[in-house]
Structures are given as structure tokens and as C-alpha cells.
Amino acid sequence: MHQMISIFLFLTVVSGTIIVVSAENWFVIWLGLELSTLALIPILWFCFTPRNIEATIKYFLVQAFSAALLLNSALIQAWFSGSWSALIPMESFPSLCLSVALAFNLGLAACHFWLPDVLQGLPFIQGLIIATWQKIAPLFLLFYFNQLNFSYFIILAALISILVGGWGGLNQTQTRKILAFSSIGNMGWIVVTSAFSLGTAAMMLFIYLVINTSIFLILDFLSIFTLGHLNNTSQLSPISITLVILTILSLGGLPPLTGFILKFSSLYSLINNGFIFFSSVMIIGSLLSLFFYLRIAFNTTLILFPQHLISLTAWRNSTEAEPLMAKTWLVSSFSVLSILAIPLTIPLYINV
């Protein structure tokens, strides 16, 4: 694909999200979502392999169904109220249709089945766009929607997503599928929190974007597609392995890393509002996900598979790895800053 075409498509994806965030008319919101989706499709099948095309078609079908459901809910709401304004509280049936459409967009349970297969069939960079940027517009819609209509369907779907995200990643060996289930779980955390504290949910979204961007870029630079690649530590420097493990554990919410703020802020907000049961379910789901993240770290650092003695220092003498290591150091700086600096900002957001 020509570079100018790629830039144009990326700008169109960004423009679609900006239109959704700034619009107050349901038709314009639908138009922004469609613009972003249609511009992303050529970017997704950039590699043009059978697995890549299959994942792209799955993503297109899911997003087309979601957009049709959203437009249908907007039409029914316009029929009830006589207006296309998104500022008017919705009736019960269009509210349910919109909740299902947003659940498909965000990959919430039980509308999540497409996400692991799609991310597994795409390269890391394209998967990063779906797991981060494409979640911003539906989440902003959900944030605004929760202020007008409290949807128990969305809350239930988010709680189930936290459990599915933890349970589904236990038997996975593909890193992209692990990241997909992690995305499902983290979306559940953000959605539940948005119903009770919009400011905390916005902060959690920012932290999620930072951590997810870091881990996708690191795994892409190091070409780590399976857990077996992580076990082959002789081909990577200790700095790279440490960075991968810290970022993965941060994604799981291990204190005192960045991801812990995401979980701590949410639980603090829910417990203050008296939702102890919701908090208990979320903690159980978080422990499940943290278990397989800790298992990855254990297998990578404490288990050394049989290999030749010369290969143990191969990374030190390799000249071909220098450009790769330069990219890794660039991402490392970004990741380490996020790991060390963000926990210091807790008092700015929470009055203990």
C-alpha cells in the first residue's frame, strides 16, 4: 500500500472517532463509526494472507451488525421522541438495542467471541488499533449513555467480561489471544466503573491505553507470538525480558505497577458507593488474570530450558539485533516511565 494512502486512511480513522466524540446527533454518531470502520478495513488486510483476510472479514461483519443495531436503536428513539438528538434520555427498547451494539463494539461478554480470533489473525500493529483506538468512540458513547440511562444489561455484561477475561486466558499459549482476553477483562473494569464515577473511568481508560500500547509494541518489536518465544530467553537480552515481564504484570494489575491503579481506583469508587458484591466479583476475575500473568513470568524467568552453553551469550555478540534493540530501548523508555511515574499520581485522583 502506498504511503500516502496509508496516511489518508489513518487520518480518516482518527477523524471518525473525533466525529463520534464531538457529535450530539445519532445519525452523525453512526456516520462517524462507519467512517472509522470502513477506513480501517484496508489497513487490516495489509498483509493479505488468508488468516489476515479471515480476521478482517470477521471484524467487518461484527462492526456492520453493531452499526446496524445502533442505527436501528436511533431510528426507534427518533420515532418515540421525534428528534435525533443524543441529549434526550432513551426509551427502554432502543436503550437495550444500543447497549447490545456497544457491547459488540467493545467486545464485552457475551458479545466477545469475535475479538480473540480477530486479534490472533492480525499483526500486532493492526491489533493494537482495534484493542486501543477503536475502543475510544464506543467508550465515550457509553460514558455519556450511562449518565442518561443506567443500563443493567451493560453492567451485567461488564461483570461477566471480567470473569471471562480471567478464565479465558488460563489455557492460552498465543500472546495475541492472551492480550485479547486481557482487553475483554479490562473493558469490563472500565465499563463498571463508568456507571459510578466518570472521572475514575476516564483515568482508567488512559492507563489502559498506555499499558496496552506498550505491550503490543514490545511484543511486535521482539516478535513474540507464543509463550514458547518468551521461554527462549537466550535470544533476548535481560533488559528486554525484564521489560516484557514488568509490562505484562502491570497489565494484570500487580502492585505497585501502573495497572494496579486501574484496579485500585475502580474498587475504591465502587466500595465508596456500597457495591460490595460487584467489587468481590471483579476481584475474583482479576485474580484469575493475574494468575496466568504470574505463570508467564515464572516460566520465563525461573525455568531455563536445555540449550547449548554458547547460545546463552548469543545476544551479546549479535550485530543484527542492534536496530531491533534500538527500537526496544525506545519503547522501554516509554514503558518504564509509565510504570514508575503513574503510581505517584494517585493522590491527584483519589482523596484518601
Curated annotation (Swiss-Prot):
Lineage: Eukaryota, Metazoa, Echinodermata, Eleutherozoa, Echinozoa
A GO BP annotation: mitochondrial electron transport, NADH to ubiquinone
Organism this protein belongs to: Paracentrotus lividus (Common sea urchin)
Protein name: NADH-ubiquinone oxidoreductase chain 2
Entry-linked InterPro entries: Complex_I_Subunit_2 (IPR050175), NADH_DH_su2_C (IPR010933), NADH_UbQ_OxRdtase_chain2 (IPR003917), ND/Mrp_TM (IPR001750)
Function: Core subunit of the mitochondrial membrane respiratory chain NADH dehydrogenase (Complex I) that is believed to belong to the minimal assembly required for catalysis. Complex I functions in the transfer of electrons from NADH to the respiratory chain. The immediate electron acceptor for the enzyme is believed to be ubiquinone.
Key word Ion transport present: no
Recorded GO MF terms: NADH dehydrogenase (ubiquinone) activity
Catalytic activity: a ubiquinone + NADH + 5 H(+)(in) = a ubiquinol + NAD(+) + 4 H(+)(out)
UniProt membrane topology term: Multi-pass membrane protein
